Design a protein with these regions (language model features):
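A glycine-centered beta-loop-beta connector
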Residues: 30-33, 38-54, 96, 104-119
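Tandem CBS (Bateman) regulatory domains
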Residues: 1-12, 52-82, 88-97, 118-148
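The conserved cystathionine-beta-synthase
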Residues: 16-34, 41, 82-100, 107
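Short, flexible active-site loop motifs that bind/organize anionic cofactors or intermediates
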Residues: 13-16, 46-47, 82, 111
């Protein structure tokens, strides 16, 4: 399965954040849209980073001062690993496992068109396994009939 098909199946609108927005705004958006990360985009809608719940916990709340005034650009991951819509889902799983990340922005022509999570990929693999099991249970029944 291609990433393009996966983000179409998910059908969720991509939520993003700007580098000059505050961590409070990130937390509100993560909570409102039930997300674990947000791609960070510039004024031209190009991907410039990603911020995750883990970034906030490790880099912001570990500080002794308040996070209210901290800007996204201060704690976001700037070297973003991303995928394209034409990549295979298996490739995305391999990259996420190798890089130890749980969210992979999908970029086309420099713009974020989707966000794939490890959970999305696991859900697809689980569905594929269920389908395989269903068909494998039907197969013996069909082959037992004599062909006339």
């Amino acid at each position: 399965m291609k990433i393009r098909e996966l983000i179409k199946v998910g059908g969720r609108e991509v939520q993003t954040i700007g580098p000059n927005q505050t961590i409070s705004e990130v937390v509100q958006k993560l909570s409102k849209f039930n997300r674990g990360s947000l791609p960070v985009i510039d004024e031209h809608e190009h991907l410039v980073g990603i911020i995750t719940e883990r970034d906030i916990v490790r880099k912001c709340f570990a500080r002794s001062d308040s996070c209210d005034a901290v800007k996204v650009k201060e704690i976001m991951t700037k070297e973003v690993v991303y995928s394209t819509p034409d990549d295979d889902a298996e490739y995305a799983v391999m990259v996420m496992k190798q890089k130890r990340i749980r969210h992979l922005p999908v970029v086309e022509s420099g713009k974020v068109v989707g966000l794939v999570s490890m959970r999305d990929l696991l859900d697809i693999q689980l569905e594929n396994c269920k389908t395989e099991v269903r068909y494998s249970q039907l197969l013996p029944r069909r082959t037992q009939r004599p062909i006339v």
